[in-house]
Amino acid sequence: MKSEKSRTTSWLFQSHEVTEILGRVKKNRKKLVKGLHRAGPPPEKNYLPDSPALSPIELKQELPKYLPALQGCRSVEEFQCLNRIEEGTYGVVYRAKDKKTDEIVALKRLKMEKEKEGFPLTSIREINTILKAQHPNIVTVREIVVGSNMDKIYIVMNYVEHDLKSLMETMKQPFLPGEVKTLMIQLLSGVKHLHDNWILHRDLKTSNLLLTHAGILKVGDFGLAREYGSPLKAYTPVVVTLWYRAPELLLGAKEYSTACDMWSVGCIFGELLTQKPLFPGKSDIDQINKIFKDIGTPSEKIWPGYSELPAVKKMTFSELPYNNLRKRFGALLSDQGFDLMNKFLTYYPGRRINAEDGLKHEYFRETPLPIDPSMFPTWPAKSEQQCVKRGTSPKPPEGGLGYSQLGDDDLKETGFHLTTTNDGAVSCRPWCSLLF
């Protein structure tokens, strides 16, 4: 068994590594602010929530180990909190105003559950990834600021008015075809830039896509992002929020690459067209069920290596027809558009279209053409009014395969039922069975 120390260091960065990342943040700032600004009049009452002030003795005892790396970062008290936008798995986001410049920014408070031990790996990955991936269609990190006792850390980002998930929940009509094309071009441009820089996002979904009043799409929330290499390494398969998770991940593959992001792009494409999630599963196995019913049951012929996937070795699936997805869209999608959709949702990851080729697809060149982003209509910014609730969207994965939770379709004829057979096998009738 690993020692407590080894378990801790497996997910934490030490002070010198934090210093290196923060140095890159400061290099991107136009003006370097030296030292913490603790002097002056008391902060306004509506500054961002923070911890009570500590005495000098308590401060010495409580300061986290990464303290030296944060010297030179501004204090969060230099920002006025306007409202809380939303809370996710990896942090809380506020809309705030810089008291010095009056600029409106987004502040993401990182979740630091073990901050006295070191800097969380997910937080350092998120900062590092965004800094490496500067692009017009990716959120911009401006700087890092800290709480008054150096016990809370915030990422300062450019404020963006909407996320697509919340926006679509308030829209009375879906996006026009030309608007969908514009959004998809921007999404593919951002994803291409990530993949060109050897970065997997691993949590692409509509709630992580931001939209400015000027019609510019920004890919956000890099809490699950990581760099990848060639040859592929074994990664955890429990990534990507369930509704947007590629079939190879659902079936337990540990070696995966950019294709898992491209499946998510296909799911987003369908959601932009219909304002509804394409495959809204309630568990891993319900998600597989929904995909197979629309696209058909895969085989070794169309997906080389399929029979060797961990879940496939433990389950057998009934043959469902291929491919029923076209009727989901009707007149919303042209033949070229459906061809692109099929390329995003190709079972075999090695044949799934990449972002670069997606941008070259004929769908974006047929009428109606993509519109200029500046021609997008404007909508009231929900993030300026209240804490945004994510509705029924599932949370990002936190670990484990949810085979014990079954969705609505589980009790329908087209779903599956867990029963015990005479030979001791567990059957998921009528379309799959578990093998032991």
UniProtKB/Swiss-Prot annotation:
It is found in: Cytoplasm; Nucleus membrane; Endomembrane system; Cytoplasm, Perinuclear region. It comes from Rattus norvegicus. Its EC number is 2.7.11.22. It is an enzyme of class 2 (transferase). GO terms for molecular function: ATP binding; cyclin-dependent protein serine/threonine kinase activity; protein serine kinase activity; protein serine/threonine kinase activity. Residues 30-44 are annotated as: Calmodulin-binding. This is Cyclin-dependent kinase 11B. May interact PAK1 and RANBP9. p110C interacts with RNPS1. Interacts with CCND3. Interacts with CCNL1 and CCNL2. Forms complexes with pre-mRNA-splicing factors, including at least SRSF1, SRSF2 AND SRSF7/SLU7. One of its GO terms (cellular component) is nuclear membrane.
